[in-house]
Regions:
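Alpha-helix termination/capping residues and helix-transition junctions
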Residues: 1, 59-62, 191-193
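A general structural motif
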Residues: 2-4, 39, 65, 126, ...
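Asp-based phosphoryl-transfer active-site loop
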Residues: 2-21
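Conserved phosphate-coordination/catalytic loops
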Residues: 21-25, 100, 176-180
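Charged helix-capping and loop-helix junction motifs
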Residues: 24-27, 143-145
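Active-site phosphate-binding/coordination module
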Residues: 25-121
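Conserved acidic, metal-coordinating active-site core of Asp-based
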Residues: 104-197
Length: 197
């Protein structure tokens, strides 16, 4: 039996252009040819939510993936044709970090913090709480306040701070501590029984 290879790539600024960075002209054709190999299981990895990933796949005519890690690692999908199946086993692993609290309960704890504005519902996920903020040069004070508020409920969290360069907007994602793109990828590789080579 031929061994299976898990090929994972981030989308923005790796496989696809984003912002002012130009696309490498041969990247997609070469990638498409490689991804079509029968021994390849393809995973796209993104900080973005499902709808944006689906749009990027369509817009750039990317090969259909077998798996998608989205929401900065808070979501893991198995893709079968046009059907995206959320991996419940991944959700169970990361949900433990929030100590039984849900998305809305954690959001309520942060409601009084100034300069945080909850992102649209389409950009939220069961295990990802996303906010807009001022594009701070040093977000350390804000991040300390967020950690302090969420420590009240013993939630173990991972804070992801970034700035959208196109809109000059600060972005804060709050995830379970064990949710990350790398951890989701390691979980997927292990669940597929693909050795690390």
């Amino acid at each position: 039996m031929e061994s299976i290879m898990l090929v994972a790539t981030d989308l923005d600024r790796t496989l696809l252009p984003n912002g002012q960075q130009a696309e490498s002209p041969l990247a997609r054709p070469l990638f498409r040819r490689f991804a079509s190999r029968p021994d390849v299981r393809l995973a796209y990895v993104s900080g973005r939510h499902r709808a944006v990933v689906e749009d990027a796949i369509a817009e750039y005519d990317l090969p259909k993936p077998d798996f998608v890690i989205g929401d900065v690692g808070a979501s893991l999908y198995e893709v079968r044709g046009d059907t995206w199946l959320a991996r419940a086993d991944w959700c169970e692993v990361i949900a433990k970090d929030w100590a039984g609290y849900g998305h809305d309960e954690l959001a309520a704890l942060l409601a009084a913090l100034p300069n945080l504005r909850l992102q649209e519902a389409s950009k939220q996920a069961p295990h990802k709480l996303s906010y807009y903020a001022e594009p701070l040069a040093d977000p350390a004070v804000l991040l300390v306040r967020v950690r302090r508020e969420l420590a009240q409920v013993a939630a173990r969290i991972n804070l992801i701070w970034s700035v959208d360069e196109t809109t000059h907007t600060g972005l804060l994602d709050i995830l379970p501590a064990s949710a990350s793109k790398l951890h989701a990828l390691e979980f997927l590789r292990t669940s597929l029984r693909i050795p690390l080579e």
